[in-house]
Amino acid sequence: MTETLSGVTVVTHPLVQHKLSYLRDRDTPTVHFRKLAGEVTLLLTYEATKDFPTEPAEVETPLERTEVQRIAGKKVAVCPVLRAGLGMLDGVLSLVSSARVGFIGLYRDEETLRPVEYYVKLPELGDGERDAIVLDPMLATGRSSAAAVAAVKEAGARSVTLVCLVAAPEGIDHLQGEHADVRIVTAAVDRGLDERGFIVPGLGDAGDRLYGTK
């Protein structure tokens, strides 16, 4: 079950919404938050990959030779935004185990709300034959996600999909303003941002809740 508006797909499946309710709950402990984040990401990945191109191949079943469909081109690249995006990585890899993995290190300056890049390590994308999934739990102001998408595009990805747990309208507008061709897949679009740039109602600081820091 999904709702799609202007390049944003909100996955409304009951399992996603049920698990999201516990991610939002401030009393959910770190160990459960971490597990739930991976499970929701797994379910979002199913939707995020639905338009990947396929090509025919042939295999031998125990009974006969038959034609099958396989994802076309090179293996997908999964690129979590450090550090919080790491909490989503296993959810994707549980479905797309052959994916290549890249890392984009960004943190948000809490005064300017602008992203600061400190590390980028991506798989080979320069041939334009590899689709990329960027993982960023919270699409808040959209600046960090936009910077991560820009890095992946610059490296040569064929297409880019952003998967996030929760998005704010402000973040969606900013990302689409800079990267109109990027599809966004999320479990929810929330009301907006508070004066500190946090999504409300949101689920708090995803990185802190994943790793038990403050």
Range-by-range predicted roles:
Residues 1-214:
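PRPP-associated nucleotide enzymes
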